[in-house]
């Protein structure tokens, strides 16, 4: 029951956070959008001074590193609260939370809300909607890569929790 509440709360918190960030700054997730859109935005008058450029995969990873560290810490706490007693249970709990939030963001927030809310799109790019904003394959195509990141984060989070459990039980 605790795990279900954690999943729901995490989905709501991260969903609301993403909606607020996108409403505040439509170019917030530009590095995750199709390259064609990134190129157009780079040359638009209002965005030239924002240092928007096409990032390499390594640069995208480095940009996401603080978020991954946050998630690792959060999953250590959440799996402990949910009552994970073994490495395998903790891993399943952590991965379940990660995947639930990932799927909620990609399918509900991006495919459901963002793809159908033109007023939050980058002004001047509406003509590219079919190939960018409403391209569900783009959003769904990001799921496997992010799921792999989730597996790594879950292993790190649960390894730490598991080591701490052994350390405290030995003393």
List the predicted regions and their residue ranges.
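Membrane-interface helix-loop junction between the first two transmembrane segments
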Residues: 20-44
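Loop-to-transmembrane boundary segments
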Residues: 52-65, 134-151
